Amino acid sequence: MVEEILSLGFESLELSHGIRSSQLEGVLQARERHKFSVSSVHNFLPMPVEVLTDSPDCYEFTSHRAKDRDRAMRLTLSSIDWAEKLGAPFVVVHTGRIRSLNLTAPLRKMVEQGKIYSREFIKRKLEAVQAREKVAEIYTARILEFLGEAVAHAGKRGVKLGIENREYYEAVPSEREFPDFLQRLDAAHTGYWHDFGHAQIKHNLGLIDHAQHLEKMAPRLIGCHIHDTRPPFRDHCPPFTGETPFDQLVPLLPQKCATVLEMSPRTEAADIVKAVSEWHQKFK
């Protein structure tokens, strides 16, 4: 996989979840051979040995099980250590979700049925907001209780944690909560990681305004995952093949923001090369 990515002309790449411990030695050898840089590490790296398939949310800081929250912490500390070893400045982190609520799936179904402007949809969305607001702080407190140790460890290793926005409304923090959430973490070692596809999905659900959210988060933005979304919810598509308004959004990024192309494994190499070429023409 590394060889294939480099063959497309990339000189830097993100090492993501799904890489096993047994594969990391090969990655290190390829890095020594090709001298590529690692832009970021995505939690959890390496993949937990007890997990059989790629699952970045297999352990969450929001879990009601203390042992799962502790496991999430240990795995995050390991990811930070690997980031330092690989010279990666960032670790992208999922902070968890409210598993007891089922909010996003019903809203998605109604959008797919063309009901986004119906009274029924508005009623369901308001109910989702109210249900989430009742319990959100409980889960936020769980995250912060454990995340503080990871932030301190990242500081010692010279690494920043990028807290990523997610595509479902059960995620913690929500877009509304993000500014306050980050204020409760050390700004020297944490920041916001913007996923364009996830934000566009939330936009298509009527939960956020993509541009307004990105503009609001710009002061804490340290990196982003770039991919497009085809209506209404198919993300990880090459840029400029969906409906994400990159021409409007990219100028909102701070100058020193890390940018990582995050494609579906099914994406054809030629489509990636075409998207990168167009991106450079527009934004470089």
Language model: regions and residue ranges:
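Histidine-acidic metal/acid-base catalytic patches
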Residues: 1-6, 21, 32-34, 78-92, ...
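N-terminal pre-domain/capping segments
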Residues: 1-79, 84-88, 107-120, 277-280, ...
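Short, basic/glycine-rich phosphate-binding loops at helix/coil junctions
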Residues: 55-56, 121-127, 225-230
